[in-house]
């Protein structure tokens, strides 16, 4: 994922937390705030309580990969922060993807069938 698709600055994180709305399930919390750009931006937060640096980085890589795969179905004019909760470190990729897409659907950031999935015609 390119750097212009990431929330990096502390002031941006604080603005999203303060002014944005939150949605959650058992494994993830998502804060979102509309932006004036023509693309979404994502920030990631993984606590040190979830494991050592290797584990935390693996979680972040998986989250970025899930978002990259769902890129075509994500709303464009929003900044959002994904916070991983305790228990995420034990999930496999498929279960993590299911949980993350669930909370993104709750927040209406992810809209199924709105993107790069190709429709197949049956004759």
From Swiss-Prot:
The protein's matches in SUPFAM superfamilies, at most eight in alphabetical order, are given as: Ribosomal protein S5 domain 2-like (SSF54211)
The broad enzyme category this protein falls into is: hydrolase
Please tell me whether the keyword Hydrolase is annotated for this protein. Answer: yes
Show the Pfam families listed in the entry: Ribonuclease_P
- Enumerate the Gene3D superfamilies for this protein: 3.30.230.10
HAMAP family for the chain: RNase_P
Name of this chain's protein:
Ribonuclease P protein component
* Organism encoding this protein: Streptococcus pneumoniae (strain Hungary19A-6)
């Amino acid at each position: 994922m390119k750097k212009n698709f990431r929330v990096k600055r502390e002031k941006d994180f604080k603005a999203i937390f303060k002014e944005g709305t939150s949605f959650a399930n058992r494994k993830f919390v998502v804060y979102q705030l509309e932006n004036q750009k023509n693309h979404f931006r994502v920030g990631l937060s993984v606590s040190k309580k979830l494991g050592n640096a290797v584990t935390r980085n693996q979680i972040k890589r998986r989250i970025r990969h899930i978002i990259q795969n769902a890129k075509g179905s994500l709303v464009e004019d929003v900044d959002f922060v994904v916070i991983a909760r305790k228990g995420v470190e034990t999930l496999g990729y498929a279960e993590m993807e299911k949980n993350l897409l669930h909370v993104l659907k709750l927040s209406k950031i992810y809209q199924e069938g709105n993107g790069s999935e190709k429709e197949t015609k049956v004759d």
